[in-house]
Amino acid sequence: MKPDAHHVKQFLLRLQDDICQTLSAVDGANFIEDSWRREAGGGGRSRVLRNGGIFEQAGVNFSHVHGDAMPASATAHRPELAGRSFEAMGVSLVVHPHNPYIPTSHANVRFFIAEKPGADPVWWFGGGFDLTPYYGFEEDAVHWHRTARDLCQPFGDDVYPRYKKWCDDYFFLKHRNEQRGIGGLFFDDLNTPDFDHCFAFMQAVGNGYTEAYLPIVERRKAMVWGERERNFQLYRRGRYVEFNLVWDRGTLFGLQTGGRTESILMSMPPLVRWEYDWQPEAGSPEAALSEFIQVRDWI
């Protein structure tokens, strides 16, 4: 089957709806929607839930942008894209809970296609999901990775280990020499063996996010927390901000190419703190996190 951008777009719109409805049902609060247009072509729907019963902030963004030519910054490393019209679309989301015992979660699925008359289209899928705990619970990590492995299994035995490693490698803060969290799945430039296969995998990842995350939310939402746990959560959120602004390719590309800033920065936590050379107390649950987020085989 030829690449079908319209079909992908319809799935992404439904996925945004489904995830928002599911998160609202769990939380009790509703998303507000901000529809926007891109002057150069395209637009999107940014949805945010703030100060809910469980989630301090959850952002679920759909975007679809298109144009007659790629920016020079994009074609410098991909000369085959020069002179082609393009479409880029995706759903991206980040959930920051109130309760420090519930991890922050992130997911993204996307599709890109560039075309010109008389030539085959250039296209690929990308995406994944990853988990950032503040307090480590092994059963949560095992569930998260088992869900990831199970959705990958129909697509080949090597898919989960390959995309788990890619996720571990990608979500790494080089300036801190530490992982952002416990990873999950990350893939990009996926265009083999064919469109149908790749699209099916992207759908499995998108649909798998809530299956991976919500059981963890349910398991941790009633845990009692106080000022100590909250301060540690805000401190660790600083690492999230550092990664997104220093290392994340999507954030940097969006800001450098005139993307919609409010939507790009929707992933930022609403509150965060830094403290010079802060060190957790030896033997404390906070100190245990650095060991917990080390790369390992969880299943």
Swiss-Prot record:
SUPFAM superfamilies hit by this protein: Coproporphyrinogen III oxidase
Enzyme class: oxidoreductase
Catalytic activity from the UniProt record: coproporphyrinogen III + O2 + 2 H(+) = protoporphyrinogen IX + 2 CO2 + 2 H2O
Region (Important for dimerization) location: 240-275
Site (Important for dimerization) residue list: H175
Pathway annotation from the record: Porphyrin-containing compound metabolism; protoporphyrin-IX biosynthesis; protoporphyrinogen-IX from coproporphyrinogen-III (O2 route): step 1/1
Keywords in alphabetical order: Cytoplasm, Heme biosynthesis, Metal-binding, Oxidoreductase, Porphyrin biosynthesis
Binding residues annotated for a divalent metal cation, in chain numbering: H96, H106, H145, H175
Chief site of localization: cytoplasm
A Gene Ontology cellular-component term: cytoplasm
InterPro entries (alphabetical): Coprogen_oxidase_aer, Coprogen_oxidase_aer_sf, Coprogen_oxidase_CS
Protein's cellular compartments: Cytoplasm
Binding site for substrate: S92, N108, V109, R110, G258, G259, R260
A GO molecular function held by the record: coproporphyrinogen oxidase activity
Required cofactor(s): a divalent metal cation
Enzyme active site: H106 (proton donor)
Function in brief: Involved in the heme biosynthesis. Catalyzes the aerobic oxidative decarboxylation of propionate groups of rings A and B of coproporphyrinogen-III to yield the vinyl groups in protoporphyrinogen-IX.
Similarity remark: Belongs to the aerobic coproporphyrinogen-III oxidase family.
Subunit structure: Homodimer.
Protein's name in the database: Oxygen-dependent coproporphyrinogen-III oxidase
